[in-house]
Amino acid sequence: MKTSKFIVYTVSIALMFTAGFLIGNTKDFKMPLCSFSASDNVIPVVNSNYFNITYNEISNAKESIDIILYEFKWYDSNNSVVKIRESLIDAAERGVSIRIILDQSEYWDQITELSKENKKTGDYLAGKGILVKYDSLKQTTHNKMLIIDNEIVILGSHNWGYSAFTKNNEASVMIKDKGTAEYYGDYFENLWNNL
């Protein structure tokens, strides 16, 4: 448990440092894949590197994928978000259990455009056999997190939209640690069971 707490603290500090660095450097730049990490189990994931890492982890999932997202944009044309969406369907067809929690929000009694896109994406995935739930209209779920095979957690600032995958300055982290995955898995279960 001490190791898991250490990893959570280390990741939090790394995210704050990375976010501060990126905020101060807003020029368009591409970061190479990280060649260092706080440990072999904590891997910084910034900017467009997120797509490849997330896509590969989804493609290699064997048992389960649990996802919480603020935004999972809908696109008709083929792009990185469509590839992620289709990789989830492929995983479900391989027998991987997939559950997704998406935000739906209402402001001034109006359903937001973001909520409409999440609903379109969620309904499409549900039609393909993926379990999808939405939070309450009065609650904002701002998470960007996925848990793969109860062993890997990817979390940070990346929404699932084309700009986040290709253009934005974003900072996330991949943690390969069962204790950390269990902690966030419990968090996911609590949200899932209360929707």
Where are these regions (language model features)?
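N-terminal Sec-pathway targeting helices
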Residues: M1-L15, G20-L22
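Ser/Thr/Pro/Gly-rich low-complexity linker/stalk segments immediately outside membranes or between
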Residues: N25-N41
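Alpha-helical scaffolding within the catalytic cores
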Residues: N49-T54, I84-E86
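Solvent-exposed loop/turn segments at secondary-structure junctions
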Residues: F51, E71-Y75, Q104-W108, K138-T141, ...
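DNA replication sliding-clamp ring fold and its partner-interaction surfaces
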Residues: E57-S64, Y184
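Primarily the HKD phosphodiesterase
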Residues: A61-G127
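Structural recognition of the beta-strand scaffold that forms the well-ordered cores
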Residues: I65-L69, I98-L102, K133-Y134, L146-I147, ...
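Signature of lipid phosphatidyltransferase scaffolds
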Residues: K144-I148, I152-L195
